[in-house]
């Protein structure tokens, strides 16, 4: 599946399946370097909706998604930048502000991997990065669990009403 800007969740960040397009499946030959793996970090290079630059997402499954020209794959230097810390760093307000200020064009704005690398940020030592990244990832995982629970509450309510009706009858 070809990644698009529709794979970025504008409300809170993260990955979402793109259901707005029908031409997402690519059947041609793809070089291995463009096939993404579970956990890879991606960020958009084009801003079709205000606030999209600096959004980050993680690839949910290996071998299913391919990188497109509007999406950058973020690679962290081993031992220098923690993968989880980087995910949150790119989506931080300080990086997003810099990307927005440096974006080209006025209507549909663009950035580049070089402009992302040029952002000025404070980065703690690697062990602190790992701790921060782990804590933020744990919080996001708990939020995802709570959302799934909330999504199931209406079904639980219907089940309870059905059970209540059977008890009364």
Task: Describe each PLM feature range.
Residues 1, 6-41:
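Sequence-specific dsDNA recognition surfaces
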Residues 1, 74, 169:
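Conserved aromatic/hydrophobic "specificity hotspots" at molecular recognition or selectivity sites
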Residues 49-58:
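Short, Lys/Arg- and Gly-enriched loop/turn segments at beta-strand edges
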Residues 69-71:
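Glycine- and aromatic-enriched periplasmic loops at the membrane-periplasm interface
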Residues 77-98:
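Glycine- and charge-enriched low-complexity intrinsically disordered segments
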Residues 82-86, 115-159:
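Amphipathic alpha-helical segments
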Residues 92-121:
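Specificity-determining recognition surfaces
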């Amino acid at each position: 599946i070809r990644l698009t800007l529709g794979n970025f969740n504008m409300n809170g960040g993260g990955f979402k399946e793109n259901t707005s397009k029908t031409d997402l499946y690519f059947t041609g030959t793809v070089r291995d370097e463009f096939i993404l793996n579970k956990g890879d970090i991606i960020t958009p290079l084009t801003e079709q909706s205000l606030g999209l630059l600096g959004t980050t997402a993680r690839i949910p499954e290996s071998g299913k998604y391919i990188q497109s020209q509007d999406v950058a794959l973020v690679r962290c230097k081993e031992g220098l930048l923690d993968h989880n810390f980087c995910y949150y760093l790119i989506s931080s307000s300080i990086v997003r502000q810099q990307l927005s200020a440096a974006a080209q064009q006025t209507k549909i704005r663009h950035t580049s991997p070089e402009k992302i690398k040029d952002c000025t940020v404070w980065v703690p030592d690697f062990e602190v990065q790992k701790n921060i990244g782990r804590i933020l990832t744990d919080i996001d995982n708990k939020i995802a669990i709570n959302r799934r629970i909330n999504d199931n509450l209406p079904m639980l309510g219907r089940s309870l009403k059905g059970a209540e009706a059977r008890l009364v009858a």
